[in-house]
Amino acid sequence: MSASDWLALKTTLELAALTTLVLLMLGTPLAWWLASTRSRMAVVIEAVVALPLVLPPTVLGFYMLVALGPNGLIGGLMESLGLPHLAFTFTGLVLASTLYSLPFMVQPLKDAFAAVGTRMTEAAATLRASTRDSFFSIVLPLSRRGLLTAITLTFAHTLGEFGVVLMVGGNIPGQTRVLSIALYDHAESMDYAGAGLLAGGLLAASFLMLLSVYALNRRYRVVHP
């Protein structure tokens, strides 16, 4: 791997870690609300959350680029406050990746929270436990498999992002150039050895992360049938 590839690896890991952290903080309360609410708006919110699963990445990337650019809703607001717009920046990349990976965090958490049910939290409420205490002491510990799955899927998905990253962040070394774009650059320049090395690394990393999740889940089912 060249120096630029190592720099792309660093950017990729930073992007995946920050995206996962942001989604963990935002997706957890959203997933809990979706799992426990009876609001009619829940169906609409679920559809919006799942939209990145079926929407072409370039479509989402285009709208994010427009929104984050100098004439967009977010970028224009930033510039009116004397701040630079977020198009072709690492911060903008994190925002776009957060939106694109949203269903990979929310859906596993929602399913895990729904599996826990409300019986134990209602029992805790009769003992004057607050909703916050019930969530952190009962719901989250019982949902740890779903939490692990959500974190792993989000991180692995962000590692391989291409379309959204290219549209919103471009290809700026040290800022927005990630491994998937570096792989594309190698392939475009007919450097198949370099492209193969990066592709194999991404494949191995993704496989090992998924393998660890399935192995831990299977072990948990054996210990707690």
Stretch-by-stretch model annotation:
Residues 55-61:
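Transmembrane alpha-helices and adjacent helix-loop boundaries
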